[in-house]
Regions:
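Glycine-centered coil/turn sites that cap beta-strands in beta-rich domains
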Residues: 17-59, 68, 80-85, 98-106
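Solvent-exposed serine/threonine-rich low-complexity stretches and specific carbohydrate-binding patches
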Residues: 66-74
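Extracytoplasmic/periplasmic beta-strand context in beta-sandwich domains
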Residues: 4, 81, 113-114
Length: 119
């Protein structure tokens, strides 16, 4: 069901994770955020090929985790979430996805991309 929203709770509130397509992707993929550079928010899209436990985290340039956007099991599909950096300073940030197929103890897919916050 397109545009089905799933909410993930964290310390900064509820973050919507939208299923933008239920078409099952052939592979896992972390897309480039848009816009980039951004202020104060940017869209992050990713594809999940199999039912998986997904973590999507944001790190600063020193490698410190500044936000966890997703930490839950997701069904196959194409997803989008919004990263709001309203309370963060300008600079380079990295977003990392870590996917573990449901029932597996080993990682299935991991990728990291760079984004720039300009205030």
């Amino acid at each position: 069901f397109p545009n089905q929203e799933i909410y993930t709770a964290n310390l900064s509130g509820l973050i919507p994770v939208s299923l933008i397509s239920s078409e099952i992707p052939m592979e896992y993929k972390l897309h480039s955020n848009y816009p980039n550079p951004f202020n104060p928010s940017t869209r992050i899209q990713f594809d999940i090929a199999k039912a998986s436990f997904v973590r999507l985290r944001i790190f600063d340039a020193l490698g410190k985790e500044v936000r966890e956007l997703i930490n839950k099991e997701l069904v196959p599909g194409k997803y989008e979430t919004i990263f709001n950096a309203l309370n963060l300073t300008s600079g380079v940030y990295f977003y990392m996805i870590d996917v573990r197929q449901t029932g597996s103890k080993t990682g299935e897919f991991k990728d990291t991309k760079k984004m720039i916050l300009v205030k």
